[in-house]
Amino acid sequence: MAPDESKLQRPTGVLQRAPSGHLGPEYKRNDEKPSATVSTKVAHENVTILPQTPQLIALLTMIRSKTTNRADFIFYSNRINRLLVEEALNHLPVLPSTITTPVAGRTYAGVKFQGKICGVSIMRAGEAMEQALRECCRSVRIGKILIQRDEETSRPRLFYDKLPEDIRDRWVLLLDPMLATGGSALMAIDVLLGKGVPEERILFLNLIASPEGAANFAQRYPKVRIVTAFVDEGLDEKNYIVPGLGDFGDRFYTL
């Protein structure tokens, strides 16, 4: 079922003031470190924002800049995507696993992941995040969902989905780099739930989110875990994320 956009928290065009922080090595004083914009905080327990480290902010600075060429945009986006996948894997359940090392038969008490995972990309921008998932999880299954806005109703419409047959038995990493109003992502969640995937087994990964989109998601699906690199100031009158980075799909695939 398509989400009723009239029930979503709508943008007002009034942006939150972006917070700032001093970034640099911990051994330096704040007056020796530059001040930079960091993520807006949100009060939703199911939203995880990556630590606002100098590395992450430097990577985000590169992909936000309008002068960054396509090759660099792809390279730095992939680095952030890798950080997102690594963080998402931290939210999966594990089981105890004791192994024997090659050193004199010594044992090591460790853990192993519980259950199977798969990725699902919201086409086409979400496909840009698949490489990072494959680099972290060998032979991972990846499904696809195509959702586009209906020109007559202005509501998201499902055009296509191809998902693993046993997806209901897997943990799902849903991939889409930008979370604006959340309309398309909410429909994607509906598709997954319709296939029998439990809500608490879905993790939604994105590079940049708006406070409005994060709130819509958290309120409608409080058991879905959102993992994002940055929550921006908000949405403008055209529902563009501000300050944003432009059209991710265009910059990754064509520009």
What are these regions (language model features)?
Residues 2-255:
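PRPP-associated nucleotide enzymes
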